[in-house]
Regions:
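Ligand-recognition surfaces built from glycine- and aromatic
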Residues: 242-280, 399-408, 415, 431, ...
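Short carbohydrate-recognition loop motifs
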Residues: 110-127, 139
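Short, solvent-exposed beta-strand-to-loop segments that form ligand-recognition rims
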Residues: 229-247, 378-391
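Extracellular/secretory pathway-exposed regions associated with glycan biology
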Residues: 262-354, 424-428, 433-444
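Secretory/extracellular carbohydrate-interaction modules
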Residues: 126-190, 296
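Short, aromatic/His-centered strand-loop micro-motif at the edge of beta-sheets
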Residues: 191-214
Length: 444
């Protein structure tokens, strides 16, 4: 085994773990009368001293033999080893030092040494820090974080670049145990963090607003479980990781102080790599298949008109819903229009009705939309997060709870066209007929 960088298979002697500027002794599985300490694998801090880390790599080897008149006089030999930072498939847990040599930082970062933190602390007052020379896919990540103020400290994993990664972040608050968005997971794709498209991955959590919190993340394929502090069952269950990448780097983001990070590659606690079943799988009322237009800029204050819908020859493509009936425009286009203007795109589908009738429709969207049936406007509304009174339930996120309206249908084929505009984070649409009897939705 290899725990915290200490080789635990040594016979009858203590291994001295050399990490940055502190050292801790580790007992071996066997007892030697010349080496004090219990016969189990546990760290015992006997001495602290300055020692530079000059060698890296797997079991870098013996660096130096150290003998002390007092603390070490009963020890025959103490051999100094370095931890192995690169994570290989099937490797044992690795402790990550919070030292400048291991992290690439942006903005305001401090590396600190305090009693009781053998591997140091990293304080991110703002910005973030990327762990060097690490590629992470599946496994367990554990760390402690002491939050600073009311920011959103967290960890990004499977980071491909600045625009694509998975993100878990905290929203410490005095009412955090009851605050629905205290802990959140969201993917970032094409440079857009999609927190407002996945409200099902935001939850209450037993976080301490002031003080240390222990976070344990288990990642397996398309799933993730998150445990907070002493929780024995997951605080947050992510049935499907929604990012576009399956492996990549690790990044911590502030504000917060981080310590005691341990990565256990491929340790997934039996968590299946397959995504959980879509809760709306088999729902025959979801409008799942659409045609999507190209995007254009829509000046603020202007409404979309039916006669502005792009012609059939102007680059339409088919698109199907993701989980929960979400049409994810951000995954297609990112945030294509800079500045104050909104990006607008059109979606259209055909609903065939057995007779002339009306149907109740549940609809979710971000941020503004206009719905036309056979060329006539039947519904328009806004779901603006930045204007609190204009937020639709649940709290400005995209959900079928956002709104409802009556859909008028003629006998035969009916064209349903939706113009949807956005300039704030996730860009998406959900449409569901409460009762699909007597209608036929477009097939894939």
């Amino acid at each position: 085994m290899f725990r915290g960088g200490a080789p635990c298979g040594m016979k009858g002697r203590h291994a001295l773990l050399c990490e940055s500027v502190q050292a801790a002794f580790w007992t071996s599985p066997r007892t030697n009368p010349q080496c004090p300490g219990p016969p189990r694998i546990t760290p015992v801090r006997l001495v602290t001293f300055s020692l530079p880390m000059e060698v890296r790599g797997s079991y870098a080897g013996v660096m130096k033999t150290l003998v002390s008149k007092d603390a070490l006089k009963r020890m025959a030999l103490c051999v100094c080893f370095l931890s192995a930072l690169p994570i290989a498939k099937g490797a044992e847990p690795v402790t990550i030092p919070m030292t400048a040599e291991h992290w690439q930082t942006k903005e305001n970062a401090e590396f600190l040494r305090e009693l009781g933190f053998y591997h140091g602390l990293m304080r991110l007052n703002s910005g973030n820090a990327v762990l060097k020379d690490i590629t992470f896919s599946d496994g367990t990540i554990e760390f402690d974080v002491n939050t600073i103020g009311r920011g959103a400290p967290g960890i990004a994993f499977r980071q491909q670049d600045e625009d694509n990664f998975e993100l878990l972040y905290l929203r410490p608050d005095p009412s955090c145990p009851a605050f629905r968005a205290c802990m959140q997971y969201a993917p970032q794709t094409h440079g857009v963090l999609l927190w407002d498209l996945f409200p099902q991955y935001q939850t209450r959590a037993p976080l301490r607003e002031n003080g240390w919190n222990h976070i344990k993340i288990v990642v397996s394929g398309r799933r993730m479980n998150v445990f907070v502090n002493d929780a024995t069952s997951p605080t947050l269950v992510v049935g499907r990781l929604e990012g576009d990448v399956m492996k990549g780097g690790l990044r911590l983001q502030g504000p917060g102080t981080f310590a005691n990070m341990v990565i256990s590659p491929d340790a997934v606690d039996g968590l299946s790599p397959e995504p959980a079943r879509d809760p709306l799988d088999g729902d025959h009322g979801l409008v799942r298949n659409w045609h999507l237009s190209t995007f254009s800029a829509l000046p603020n204050g202007k409404d979309s008109m039916y006669n502005e819908m792009p012609r059939a020859s102007q680059g339409w493509k088919t698109i199907s819903t993701e989980r929960n009936g979400l049409v994810n425009l951000s995954r297609q286009y990112g945030r294509p229009v800079p500045g104050p203007n909104r990006a607008v795109a059109w979606l259209k589908t055909t609903i065939t009705s057995d007779s002339k009738q009306t149907k109740k429709v549940e609809i979710g969207w971000t941020r503004e939309l206009w719905v036309f049936v056979n060329g006539k406007l039947v519904y328009a509304d806004k779901n603006l997060f930045e204007v609190e009174e204009a937020r639709k339930a649940p709290d400005g996120r995209c959900s079928l709870e956002n709104g409802a309206f009556t859909l008028p249908l003629e006998a035969g084929d009916n064209e349903v066209a939706v113009a949807i505009a956005n300039n704030f984070f996730g860009w998406g649409l959900m449409v569901r007929l409460a009762d699909p009897e007597g209608v036929h939705l477009a097939a894939n």
